Amino acid sequence: MTSNESAVSQALGVHSEVGRLRKVLVCSPGLAHRRLTPTNSDELLFDDVMWVENAQRDHAAFVGELRRRGVEVVELHDLLAQIMALPEARAWLLDRKITANQVGIGLIDAARAYLETLSPRELAEYLVGGLATSDLPEDFRSPHLALARESTGAREYLMPPLPNTLYTRDTTCWLYGGLTLNPLYWSARHDETLLMKAIYTFHPDFKGSKVWWGDPERDWGQATFEGGDIMPVGNGVVLMGMSERTSRQAITQVAAALFRSGAAEHVVVAGMPKLRSAMHLDTVFTFADRDVVTLYPRIMDAVHTFSLRPGDRAPGFDVVDEGSTPFVDVVAKALGLPKLRVVETGGDAYASERQQWDSGNNAVAVEPGVVFTYDRNTLTNALLREARVEVVTIVGAELGRGRGGGHCMTCPLVREPVDF
């Protein structure tokens, strides 16, 4: 690696969807997924329980292949353990996690005292994996614990597990030279962004990062924003899905913040149906090369597209209704391309619906024309290869049980721009 390449790799920022991926955040399956049961999986947003050992094996293979492709991979548990070795970071996070509203007024002292005895690595495991009422040793138990144990579902935890941390894409978005700290749609995921704020506040590799918008310590009301809906594609353009999880209220605030800072010049909004199967834009649309996208036409053909651009009048941007112009055509024009080559979900009506459900269009690129996808989506993968895209497969039988693929499982931290 040249000195110039080294400098690029260390400058946090994401400048495209397919430029060379230099650094990425992932979260390995672990304790949080061992906490999933048939009783609580719906509440924790998983369709089924995981075979955790196989999920760990498959995730490790995914990470290993990313590294072989030259990507620096950092892992959420590791980053948390590193900052939990810092007394000020530990105090900051436990002050916000161990509260009357979280653990109950009668268990604050006992839960805090127990967590303070743990090593940084053990504490990181509990912060992601959850603290069950049964985890407190006898020395830290009180009469209040019996009351807590009568609770059901995820509420039997003093700190609920966060299994959706597997999908690191959603909690933060690097948009060119800064990031957003996202208020997530479901309450089961809210504390994920708090963990990320701790990392960005205290970890030496991330301190000083520019935050465009968002703060998990605020109530954002109807303004919800998730990274699976957000794509900084280059040329100052950001794609945003207005979906089940990402609201108009958040999109307009983020767009205004990006325009004020000069970070972006055009936000293309995809108005989507509110469906779990298409919860985010990246479940039905991703880039595979500079001019190649893979998409699920049954959803994308019905998308209503809007363009937001900086404006002189309040609230600081203008809205253009793109009418009947297809989303892909609006995106192509924004990037200065005559058109985008489209790879649709493979198979007949039945097969394509199954493949989309199994994240067939949820590709993540490591460089132009090289993507990772789940192995089970054989028909879509074959079509990508016909379009001269190199497809590296991930075993997806277990990792996809929360409805996410390679794009969902990666939060790019450093990605190079591309020329259009």
From Swiss-Prot:
Keywords: Arginine metabolism, Cytoplasm, Hydrolase. It catalyses: L-arginine + H2O = L-citrulline + NH4(+). InterPro entries: Arg_deiminase. Signal peptide: none annotated. Belongs to the arginine deiminase family. GO terms for molecular function: arginine deiminase activity. This is Arginine deiminase. GO terms for cellular component: cytoplasm. It holds the Pfam family ADI. It is found in: Cytoplasm. GO terms for biological process: arginine catabolic process to ornithine; arginine deiminase pathway. Its EC number is 3.5.3.6. It comes from Streptomyces coelicolor (strain ATCC BAA-471 / A3(2) / M145). Pathway: Amino-acid degradation; L-arginine degradation via ADI pathway; carbamoyl phosphate from L-arginine: step 1/2. The active site is at residue 408.
